[in-house]
Amino acid sequence: MENMFLQSSMLTCIFLLISGSCELCAEENFSRSYPCDEKKQNDSVIAECSNRRLQEVPQTVGKYVTELDLSDNFITHITNESFQGLQNLTKINLNHNPNVQHQNGNPGIQSNGLNITDGAFLNLKNLRELLLEDNQLPQIPSGLPESLTELSLIQNNIYNITKEGISRLINLKNLYLAWNCYFNKVCEKTNIEDGVFETLTNLELLSLSFNSLSHVPPKLPSSLRKLFLSNTQIKYISEEDFKGLINLTLLDLSGNCPRCFNAPFPCVPCDGGASINIDRFAFQNLTQLRYLNLSSTSLRKINAAWFKNMPHLKVLDLEFNYLVGEIASGAFLTMLPRLEILDLSFNYIKGSYPQHINISRNFSKLLSLRALHLRGYVFQELREDDFQPLMQLPNLSTINLGINFIKQIDFKLFQNFSNLEIIYLSENRISPLVKDTRQSYANSSSFQRHIRKRRSTDFEFDPHSNFYHFTRPLIKPQCAAYGKALDLSLNSIFFIGPNQFENLPDIACLNLSANSNAQVLSGTEFSAIPHVKYLDLTNNRLDFDNASALTELSDLEVLDLSYNSHYFRIAGVTHHLEFIQNFTNLKVLNLSHNNIYTLTDKYNLESKSLVELVFSGNRLDILWNDDDNRYISIFKGLKNLTRLDLSLNRLKHIPNEAFLNLPASLTELHINDNMLKFFNWTLLQQFPRLELLDLRGNKLLFLTDSLSDFTSSLRTLLLSHNRISHLPSGFLSEVSSLKHLDLSSNLLKTINKSALETKTTTKLSMLELHGNPFECTCDIGDFRRWMDEHLNVKIPRLVDVICASPGDQRGKSIVSLELTTCVSDVTAVILFFFTFFITTMVMLAALAHHLFYWDVWFIYNVCLAKVKGYRSLSTSQTFYDAYISYDTKDASVTDWVINELRYHLEESRDKNVLLCLEERDWDPGLAIIDNLMQSINQSKKTVFVLTKKYAKSWNFKTAFYLALQRLMDENMDVIIFILLEPVLQHSQYLRLRQRICKSSILQWPDNPKAEGLFWQTLRNVVLTENDSRYNNMYVDSIKQY
């Protein structure tokens, strides 16, 4: 029995091991890129690994990758094995490693800078670009490949630049060494070995800005085209410094001897506030120069001789100096006939607030000038005569007069500019014009001495940006695209009179934001500029009390009225928006962040031309209140609307009727950042053109069972930042149009494969899942297999698709999860039925063996005998009349056999019976089994003296089977039972034998007077054949067969 169980257990274990090994083979390789996102772009293969919390270079990067971005990680070591096998790399970005900014989220990471083994990049023979910015490197890495053409070491701790580090890089074209020793670094000076750059004969760009140099490095290669020496503490530029740089096109010397007043960073001026000393012949060999930056060098005079040999100079930056006098005289301007951009911003005299601006007549010589920046000159009034020198410039298209605190301006002067496209007057003090008189409520004699800082107070500067020059577009590109632009934002035009813009009839883009305007527009204010197409009135206090507002602007296409909530918040004030219906060309209307919760008289918006409406940041939760049906159709009249933004409206639910009254022409619907717990998906059937549905930032708990039942046009579905915990099976079953599905930042613990399977060809190309608390058990394996089967579906930032449970998997990506111990459902079913079958069979076999063993054995032998027929065997010679089998270990039984049974059979007066006894007749030295077989075979009968104990012993069973074997082999029934105790009461064999040959079963009598009869009967049974005493009824029935 035990052996049978052992064998079945071993078989089961072997089967499980085989199944597990198959699973291991199937799961150990994943074809989806991880932890990086790999993509093809033109002829390049790019691996995007930035900001993935990596602590080492991943070994899973494909060997065909050409560009590898490892920036913003926690990598601390680069070794010779880091890029092994990546011989195709042409660009490596290791900027910001370790990422100190985000180190608090990984306290186990020690940040001592990036440690690079010598020669770690040497075997990358195709490497062209190597970016190692902000890595706390103490020196230039050694053993760099000669193939490098660009090397960036910005924001490190490199204080010594020697030939040993870069002399071998003969193919280098761009070298960035800026921001290594600047104002917040503990260093005294940057040491540059003499002639260190001399051997770099192909070098075209060299950046040494924000280092403590004190002088221009000597022996610079003549191949240089761009040289950045900003904020390098250089006080003197000699005639020899740039003598050999005949190919130089860009030179940045800004920040040397800086103007430090109001500086938003630690600033050290030159002694006595002196300006940088530039030799008059310092630039005489720079004949190819196109760009020169002398900003913040405390210049008070401009030497015209500097520009004598600069015939191609196009951009000149002179910001943050003391050049008010030079702007007035302008002798140097005569040397710049091809100058296109001139920046003279923030050259004001501290404490001075002149009435007018004074510019030189020599400005008229700048015939190629396209943009003039004069921010921060600081004056009170701009007259036509002041800009007379500029009016004849044929190419001038941009005038920047921002942050000048101008109070009055004669707009008529701008009519004299033939090609002017951008007029930037933001952040001044321009007041309303009423009856040709400027209204000023400011003290004209006062001047705000606190000039706005030229840079943000944020010390995290962009090392790649122009440190002093304002690089953002002056005007929104969307606005400037319509034509001539005027920016009057952040002024004091709190009232617009009919004559305000009478001298600017050709304005197409107008920005009047942040003027504290609380006017009731009546439809006449902009009559002088009827061709305006883009109007920005944001951040004012406009009162929409007149239904004719803005109707004079018949060509208006974009109207921005956002952040005018002042009067919309007041319930008792009239709120008219029906003026919108008067615009026949209006395409975009922005009413966001106005807290609109009530309208007057007319409750619906109407427009036949409007294409886009931004209604975010209002109070639709009140407008669509269950108890108020007036605004149910507020958007129904917008017949051609394609994009509607209803975000940030505090909506907890959307009435079905209100949703059905949205324009059927919608292609984009944004309902993000509300408080919706339920969304009626069935209503999407009313929008046959809807392509984008944005439901981000709500509290949705459930999704529809089948999206295809309600929309066939949807391409983008955004559901991030909700509370969705389950993705229904069949969610995308027949959706063929959906391309982008965003399920990030929800409560999904697992995703069933059936939820993403489609019956038709799917177009799904983007699936976002990061930020979900996935439960990484074997149930996630189904989704993992789907990921491997659908490589065309991009899952961005797989490193952020992480496990929340169980504890040992917490924080791991589901892609890195080891699922080899998991068994598939099919395999699990097969194993279950297999083990169930084996276990059941073993149990049934054990039960049958216990209950029906003899019956089976007997039937088997009867059948076998029937098949083989009767064969007479030669009978062995017998010496004994009977062999007595008894329990020799039982003293009472042994005594009964020797003194009673032997006496009455062998020593009786009647015919004696010769018995074979174990303790008397067995041969010494012969094996027990041999003695037993010999005793049974040499005796005519075998008598079993049975007790309860002996009937259970193996000795009895062995002797019984041997005696029974004679019946099979010799057809001789030799068995006789003497029952000293009632035993084998339920034995099928004993019951059958009692029916066939009852006399062969004797029981020791309880009555002593019956013992004589017992001995006589035993003697007769031993001396006669058993078959002569068979019950004829049974014998005859057997003989028939």
Curated annotation (Swiss-Prot):
Ubiquitinated by RNF216; leading to degradation by the proteasome. Proteolytic processing occurs in monocytes and monocyte-derived macrophages by both furin-like proprotein convertase and cathepsins. The cleavage is necessary for dimer formation and subsequent activation. Changing Y348A: Abolishes activation of NF-kappa-B. Activated by RNAs having enough uridines. Changing F405A: Abolishes activation of NF-kappa-B. Keywords: Disease variant, Disulfide bond, Endosome, Glycoprotein, Immunity, Inflammatory response, Innate immunity, Leucine-rich repeat, Membrane, Receptor, Repeat, Signal, Transmembrane, Transmembrane helix, Ubl conjugation. Changing Y348A: Abolishes responses to both ssRNA and chemical ligands. Belongs to the Toll-like receptor family. Homodimer. Interacts with MYD88 via their respective TIR domains. Interacts with UNC93B1. Interacts with BTK. Interacts with SMPDL3B. This is Toll-like receptor 8. It comes from Homo sapiens (Human).
